[in-house]
């Protein structure tokens, strides 16, 4: 595919003497001397200021470097009108690109820049505001802020439990996705549980409301029930501590569904803990320990049943800006630590473990037949209490008395669906 370059891409910058501070077609000094236009100059001076290092937008308290602005031009020569795809490379832009002399002008919609080679770009106020900070970018993308929770606070959320029928409407589905994005935990009641086959079960329909199912070596959908000679502790009746799934993958699944088909046992309640809340609490209580958990790589592995998977992750994964992106905590699948693991790591992990396992931070619920739970596998830890089968509970021959069916959901597809619904 040929690459169409914007006019400035192949034209060198013509350096000319120009005022240090330009507003429209007048420098400040020139504008102040015009008398009748002094009020206009004052108004413009409070909105935009062009200096040698970029465009300053006064109300937003933000500076936009000229190379960034040239790269962000959205005119038809720079961005294809129908595909909305960029028609040039960032590397095509001269690193020292500047506007032409007196080439910055405030217009009704925002600010127009005439570059040194004659190309013109228009940046409206909404665009500049959208890109002024990470918060404003998230708002423009219709992303929702994550809200940390404790046992007491999550119990008060009115959308923690929703009805399956609600998801068949756009408003109901939006409400479900919004709640999951904010809190990472959602229960759905009265999901049909008569059909149990993987091909036509209701979990498949339920999952597709939210996004695309992610296939792993467990398949598209999988069953969680007590089986003999299990190769995974989840397929026993033993208690299972707080953990996340598939951390031995480079990119573990973002969301997980569990649908309760049968529950005629004693015990077996599900436990959830917001590891994001625990991480933020640790950051406040002990910044040094928090830092250790963001730095030290922890290995996870699965070597069983014809598979050999291994990957390392920090316990707390942060973004370039320092925000917590996701958590990686799964003691059952943790491999031997690296030999250079510092002693401080053990203290830090002990503190983190105490936080996620504390009674005040764990939410417990026994799934009833027809209940489904959706949770963020990169944020919310899940566990299960041990259970005992009760004879004579009326299940069909060969069926387990406790039977969950599960699947994973790709995060991007659910976030995409949520943005469109908003």
From Swiss-Prot:
GO BP: any one term: carnitine biosynthetic process
EC number: 1.14.-.-
Pathway: Mycotoxin biosynthesis
GO cellular component, one term: mitochondrion
Statement: the UniProt record of this protein carries the keyword Methyltransferase: no
InterPro entries: AlphaKG_dependent_hydroxylases, GBBH-like_N, GBBH-like_N_sf, TauD-like_sf, TauD/TfdA-like
Cofactor details (free text): Binds 1 Fe(2+) ion per subunit.
CDD domains given in the database record: CAS_like
The protein's required cofactors: Fe(2+)
One of the record's GO molecular function terms: 2-oxoglutarate-dependent dioxygenase activity
Keywords: Dioxygenase, Iron, Metal-binding, Oxidoreductase, Zinc
Biotechnological utility: The structure of strobilurin A was used for the development of the major class of beta-methoxyacrylate agricultural fungicides since its beta-methoxyacrylate toxophore targets the Qo site of complex III of the mitochondrial electron transport chain and prevents adenosine triphosphate synthesis. Compounds such as azoxystrobin (Syngenta) and Kresoxim methyl (BASF) are among the most widely used fungicides worldwide. This class of antifungals are used as effective treatments against a broad range of destructive fungal plant pathogens and make significant contributions to food security.
Residues binding Zn(2+), per UniProt: 73, 75, 78, 119
Residues reported in the UniProt entry to bind Fe cation: 243, 245, 382
SUPFAM superfamilies: Clavaminate synthase-like (SSF51197)
Domain of life: Eukaryota
Biological function: Dioxygenase; part of the gene cluster that mediates the biosynthesis of strobilurin A, an antifungal polyketide that contains a key beta-methoxyacrylate toxophore that targets the complex III of the mitochondrial electron transport chain. Strobilurin biosynthesis begins with construction of benzoyl CoA by step-wise elimination of ammonia from phenylalanine by the phenylalanine ammonia-lyase str11, oxygenation by str8 and retro-Claisen reaction to form benzoic acid, which is activated to its CoA thiolester benzoyl CoA by the dedicated CoA ligase str10.
Family membership noted in the UniProt record: Belongs to the gamma-BBH/TMLD family.
Protein name: Dioxygenase str8
Taxonomic path: Eukaryota, Fungi, Dikarya, Basidiomycota, Agaricomycotina
């Amino acid at each position: 595919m040929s690459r169409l370059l914007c006019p400035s891409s192949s034209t060198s910058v013509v350096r000319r003497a120009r005022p240090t501070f330009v507003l429209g077609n007048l420098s400040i000094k020139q504008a102040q001397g015009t008398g009748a236009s002094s009020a206009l100059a004052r108004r413009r001076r409070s909105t935009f200021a062009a200096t040698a290092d970029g465009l300053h937008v006064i109300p937003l308290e933000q500076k936009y470097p000229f190379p960034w602005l040239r790269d962000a031009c959205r005119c038809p020569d720079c961005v294809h009108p129908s595909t909305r795809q960029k028609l040039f490379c960032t590397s095509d832009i001269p690193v020292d690109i500047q506007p032409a002399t007196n080439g910055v002008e405030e217009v009704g919609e925002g600010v127009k820049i005439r570059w040194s080679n004659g190309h013109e770009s228009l940046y409206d106020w909404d665009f500049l505001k959208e890109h002024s900070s990470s918060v404003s970018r998230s708002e423009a993308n219709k992303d929702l802020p994550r809200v940390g929770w404790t046992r007491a606070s999550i119990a008060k959320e009115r959308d923690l439990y929703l009805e399956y029928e609600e998801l068949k409407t756009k408003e109901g589905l939006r409400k479900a996705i919004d709640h999951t994005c904010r809190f990472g935990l959602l229960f759905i009641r009265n999901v049909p549980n008569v059909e149990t086959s993987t091909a036509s079960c209701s979990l498949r329909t339920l999952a597709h409301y939210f996004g695309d199912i992610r296939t792993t070596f467990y398949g598209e959908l999988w069953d969680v029930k007590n089986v003999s000679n299990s190769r995974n502790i989840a397929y026993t009746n033993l208690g299972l501590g707080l953990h996340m799934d598939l951390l031995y993958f480079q990119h573990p699944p973002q969301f997980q569904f569990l649908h309760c088909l049968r529950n005629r046992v004693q015990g077996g309640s599900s436990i959830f803990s917001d590891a994001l809340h625990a991480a933020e609490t640790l950051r406040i209580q002990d910044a040094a320990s928090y830092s250790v958990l963001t730095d030290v790589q922890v290995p996870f592995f699965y070597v069983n049943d014809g598979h050999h998977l291994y990957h390392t992750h920090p316990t707390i994964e942060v973004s370039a800006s320092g925000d917590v992106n996701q958590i990686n905590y799964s003691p059952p699948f943790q491999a031997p630590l690296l030999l250079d693991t510092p002693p401080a790591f053990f203290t830090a992990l002990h503190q983190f473990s105490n936080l996620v396992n504390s009674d005040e931070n764990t939410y417990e619920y026994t799934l009833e037949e027809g209940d489904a739970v959706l949770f963020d596998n990169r944020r919310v830890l899940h566990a299960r209490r041990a259970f005992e089968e009760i004879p004579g509970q009326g299940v069909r021959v060969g069926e387990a008395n406790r039977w969950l069916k599960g699947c994973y959901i790709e995060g991007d597809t659910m976030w995409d669906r949520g943005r469109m619904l908003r």
